[in-house]
């Protein structure tokens, strides 16, 4: 499961449309549809129902939203921690070289 797939799902919910979410994220509508299908297959549940009027959450999709948000938030924390660790390494290396 890829982060971008989860982000697409959340964007589709926010926009109320797979085509709108695809456009906002720079995907073709076909690619957006494939992303959702792949995510549903990986999770083993149908997340959304589609109709000419838009999309609607399934019960399974609704139950997974808190976990998806938590996972995306945790990944963001990891990214920040990694950047901070890299910055610390750079500062340490510069200080060590300056004392030599």
Task: Indicate residue ranges for each PLM-predicted region.
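Helix-turn-helix DNA-binding elements, focusing on the entry/boundary residues of the two helices
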Residues: 17-18, 36, 50
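A short LG(V/I)-centered, amphipathic sequence patch enriched
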Residues: 40-57
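Alpha-helical linker/hinge and terminal dimerization helices associated
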Residues: 42-43, 64-86
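Short alpha-helical elements of helix-turn-helix
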Residues: 1-15, 33, 62-65, 69
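Residues within the DNA-recognition helix of helix-turn-helix
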Residues: 28-31, 35-38
């Amino acid at each position: 499961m890829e982060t971008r797939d989860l982000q697409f799902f959340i964007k589709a919910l926010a926009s109320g449309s797979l085509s709108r979410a695809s456009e906002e994220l720079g995907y073709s509508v076909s690619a957006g549809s494939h992303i959702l299908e792949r995510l549903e297959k990986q999770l083993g549940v149908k997340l959304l129902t589609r109709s000419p009027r838009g999309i609607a959450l399934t019960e399974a999709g609704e139950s997974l939203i808190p976990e998806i948000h938590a996972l995306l938030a945790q990944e963001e924390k990891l990214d920040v921690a990694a950047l901070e660790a890299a910055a610390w390494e750079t500062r340490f290396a510069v200080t060590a070289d300056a004392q030599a």
